[in-house]
UniProtKB/Swiss-Prot annotation:
Interacts with numA/nucleomorphin in the presence of Ca(2+). The keyword rRNA-binding does not apply. The keyword Calcium applies. This is Calcium-binding protein 4a. Ca(2+) 2 binds at D59, D61, D63, K65, E70. One of its GO terms (cellular component) is nucleoplasm. It comes from Dictyostelium discoideum. Residues 10-45, 46-81, 85-120, 123-158 form the EF-hand domain. GO terms for molecular function: calcium ion binding. Ca(2+) 3 binds at D136, D138, D140, C142, E147. Ca(2+) 1 binds at D23, N25, D27, Q29, E34.
Length: 162
């Protein structure tokens, strides 16, 4: 499991590498021109738009440059957006089991989902039991989107821990 300290160290290293790659004048920041050149070098489709957007969003002190902390913020936001997108896709894919569309998966819906996914009845029961043991955190015999999301965050270690 990745700790917050390790995650932030990795983020800092990635930030330093990005700045190092684009910083032409050695001030440990990326100016608008340096950002543009970096994105152009990386063959971004519209480096002007990307540069202007990043500066607008993450140049917190509005000095026309991105500092290490501002770049870390940008990378962290990008990571969170990607993680949340993946989480939503994961939850949505599992919630195909919600046959009555009430935003809850019952044990029987889970079992039926596994059967229609190719498991035999015995396997489907085992899979449904396992799913409910792992995911139904409030033991109400239903799995909600939030329970599934929280399970995925923990199981796949999406966000770093203490």
């Amino acid at each position: 499991m990745v700790t917050k300290k390790e995650f932030l160290e990795d983020l800092t290293n990635a930030t330093n590498e990005m700045i190092k790659a684009g910083d032409k004048n050695g001030d440990n920041q990326l100016s608008k021109k340096e950002l543009y050149e970096l994105f152009k070098k990386c063959k971004y489709p519209n480096p002007t738009l990307v540069t202007n957007s990043l500066l607008e969003l993450f140049d917190l002190d509005k000095d026309g440059k991105l500092s290490v902390n501002e770049v870390k913020t940008a990378l962290l936001v990008d990571y969170i957006i990607e993680a949340e997108t993946c989480l939503k896709k994961f939850v949505d894919s599992i919630f195909k089991a919600d046959s009555n569309k009430d935003n809850k998966i019952t044990w029987d819906e889970a079992r039926q989902f596994f059967v229609t996914s190719g498991s035999n009845e015995a396997q489907a029961k085992v899979f449904a039991n396992s799913m409910f043991e792992d995911v139904d955190s409030d033991d109400d015999k239903c799995i909600t989107r939030e329970e599934l999301r929280e399970y995925a965050i923990e199981y796949y270690e999406i966000y770093p821990t203490e």
